[in-house]
Regions:
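A eukaryotic "domain-start" boundary segment
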Residues: 1-43
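Phenylalanine-focused residue identity feature
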Residues: 16-17, 31, 35, 47, ...
Length: 243
């Protein structure tokens, strides 16, 4: 397959769609290290969760773990879905090729050492993102933090829907409605897979999830636009829809 993916154009969709080619900065690590058990000297996943915990003043570490996972899921879905809708190809985001700076922010946090285009169908997008990253990420988080599989699945669905919605909005602004429609159609197909089925309801570009990421528990936090709650629940309801 020829090199079809224009990373500069992809990044113009929005910050979550940004991907740079190269070895990354001095703080970047391959995602294979992120999913591995924490070594004695370096722990990129724990560092990121701790950074989110401090930044949000999260009341417990599982809230920070949820928000950190949601952010990574949004980055990965956006890059893959955007590439597939724009170019009919998706970059190989193999955990040995994709590097991440746990102290960075978009667009400077993701680097791909070698851009290798793969077919841009939903099956490949799922394999690249869900099988290649979200499942090992969820396993690593659940091994270390008290966080439910259902909550993490809900975050994955929310992140996918958000990527499709942002891509669709960009496509409308740019007069490229075909790109937006391809993104929505692919998202709908991905939600039909057992891994995401039941995480929420996708209606065009609108989505309502069936679980909560727990962000509302942070000081000054509220419910997200796609949350299952209309307003932050009382403390007695904290576990009602968190997993």
């Amino acid at each position: 397959m020829t090199h079809l993916i224009d990373l500069a154009e992809l990044g113009s969709v929005g910050g979550f769609f940004a991907l740079r080619e190269g070895p990354g900065g001095p703080g970047s690590v391959p995602f294979a290290d992120v999913y591995a058990p924490p070594p004695a000297a370096r722990d990129p996943l724990g560092f990121r969760v701790g950074k989110v915990e401090r930044g949000l003043r999260a009341p417990e570490v599982r809230v920070a773990a949820s928000v950190a996972q949601l952010g990574l899921a949004a980055r990965l879905w956006s890059v893959a879905l955007g590439s597939a809708a724009l170019y009919g190809a998706v970059p190989d985001l193999d955990a040995a090729l994709l590097r991440w700076d746990p102290d960075g922010a978009s667009p400077d946090d993701l680097w791909l050492t070698d851009v290798r285009p793969l077919p841009g169908d939903a099956r490949t997008v799922r394999r690249v993102v869900a099988d290649g990253h979200l499942e090992p990420l969820a396993a690593a988080l659940r091994a270390r933090y008290r966080i439910s599989a259902g909550l993490l699945r809900g975050n994955a669905g929310s992140a996918l829907a958000g990527a499709a919605r942002e891509l669709h909005a960009w496509a409308v602004r740019e007069g490229r409605e075909d790109v937006g429609e391809r993104g929505l159609a692919m998202a709908a197909e991905l939600f039909g897979h057992p891994g995401l089925r039941g995480t929420g309801t996708l209606d065009g570009a609108a989505f309502r999830r069936r679980s909560c990421c727990l962000y509302y528990r942070c000081p000054n936090g509220g419910v997200c636009g796609d949350c299952c709650f209309e307003r932050p629940p009382s403390r007695s309801s904290h576990r009602a829809s968190s997993g």
